[in-house]
């Protein structure tokens, strides 16, 4: 399956050509895709006067897909997941996490579909807790934990991280590894100061004398 996203008018004009060329290149490498799904539904498209588009390009096909990355299995929801369904740019960061988590107690903040948490679990972490404000993302994460046989080690909770961290501190919880991968707090220059304040607040709440040990 090929999932595409176009956020700029210049790219949008050549979208069909780009998709066909990508399919040709993949075919030459022995990779034949079963279908193309477009996730050009980001709000930012409206800034260039473009409609938000989402759906299958071409013939109908099954959009459910299972992938394996760094030894971890995931069921990907390209229809309802964030952006194109999976953050491929974090592949090597997730792999690096595996080297830090064996026999450790891990807290994964802003876990989304649990990718960092699951990498910690597959690497032999003693206990992993993932936090995310999205109930849908947490449901996905739990399903992927079960898919990997990690449901007894890797647990997920639907919670606002900024609210949950003080509660964990008050309860005296301590973690060997704390993962912070927050979403973008701003997409414009005007909100930069508030974004910096938010990032600082998150890191302050995870100071070594509090959550991390």
Regions found by a protein language model. Name each.
Residues 5-9:
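Structural motif
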Residues 54-213:
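Rossmann-like S-adenosyl-L-methionine
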């Amino acid at each position: 399956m090929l999932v595409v996203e176009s956020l700029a008018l210049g790219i949008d004009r050549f979208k069909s050509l780009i998709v066909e060329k990508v399919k040709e290149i993949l075919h030459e490498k022995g990779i034949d895709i079963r279908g193309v799904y477009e996730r050009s539904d980001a709000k930012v498209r409206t800034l260039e006067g473009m409609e938000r588009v989402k759906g299958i390009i071409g013939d109908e096909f099954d959009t459910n897909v299972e992938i394996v990355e760094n030894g971890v299995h995931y069921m990907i929801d390209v229809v309802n997941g964030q952006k194109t369904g999976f953050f491929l740019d974090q592949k090597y960061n997730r792999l690096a996490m595996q080297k830090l988590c064996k026999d450790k107690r891990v807290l994964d903040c802003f876990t989304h579909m649990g990718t960092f948490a699951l990498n910690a679990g597959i690497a032999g972490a003693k206990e992993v807790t993932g936090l995310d404000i999205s109930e849908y993302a947490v449901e996905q994460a739990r399903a992927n934990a079960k898919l990997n046989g990690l449901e007894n080690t890797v647990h997920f909770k639907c919670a606002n991280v900024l609210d949950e961290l003080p509660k964990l501190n008050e309860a005296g919880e301590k973690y060997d590894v704390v993962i912070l991968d927050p979403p973008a707090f701003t997409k414009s220059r005007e909100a930069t100061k508030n974004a910096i304040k938010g990032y600082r607040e998150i890191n302050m709440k995870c100071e070594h004398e509090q959550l991390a040990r």
